[in-house]
Amino acid sequence: MTHEDLERAALWNSLVHLGPFVKTKWRMDHHDVENQVAQFKDNWCPYNVKKDSHNNRWGLPVTSHTGDVMDNYHLNSFGYMQKYHDVEMKEENFTTPTEVYHAIPEIKRLVDVFAPDIGRVHFLRIDKGGFFPPHRDFHGVSPEYFRLLTVFGRCSPENYVQMVDGKPIYPEAGCVYFANTQLDHSVFSFSDNLYALILTVKLNERTHALIMNNTMAE
């Protein structure tokens, strides 16, 4: 491991010791976000369509390679694309804001906190019967990126189940969470219109400090 790897491993270790799913101080008006997302109803595309048969998961880019909201190639598994299609895909290649970013102030404010240290940012919509099977997003002791997540829409316990490390977890709508996606996690929706915002963040001293300073009790 390089010195940079060791430094990043120490930062990651301190983050994951906060817990598997940690509420931060960042909040958004989830009703307002849901209403504003509706203007992009024709721009959702099947999520991970290159890898899986369509299972009622949809993606909407907040950032993309070109800034075009229909530039959605990155809404596929990076690992799968690299292994089976010989396409090199990196988080830093998909950070140009789309129309979605500019149209929804609540989202823009959150993304701007972490920019330019971001990777992909996108909405997920999981409709009735849609699911993510148990999986882990990152491997190794010093991942280059981590994930923040917020849910809204039909996100009450009767609408879906989310498992993290073998335990059910139900985030509060509109609250932003640090998620340890190295842990085994999955989700299954019983209803239409379960939404999540996924913000991929580059792990460095600045972003580590942002998380630490915004998860501590006031």
What feature does the model see in each segment?
Residues 125-127, 142-158:
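Short, conserved beta-strand element in jelly-roll/cupin
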Residues 186-190:
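Asparagine-centered strand-capping/turn motif at beta-strand->loop junctions
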Residues 169-184:
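Conserved metal-binding segment of the jelly-roll/cupin
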Residues 146-153, 176-178, 192-209:
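A short hydrophobic beta-strand segment most commonly corresponding to one strand
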Residues 1-113:
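Non-heme Fe(II)/2-oxoglutarate
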Residues 118, 133-148:
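A short beta-loop-beta micro-motif enriched in histidine and acidic residues
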Residues 152-172:
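A short beta-strand-loop-beta hairpin characteristic of the jelly-roll/cupin
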Residues 110-131:
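A short glycine-rich, His/Asp/Glu-containing loop-to-beta-strand
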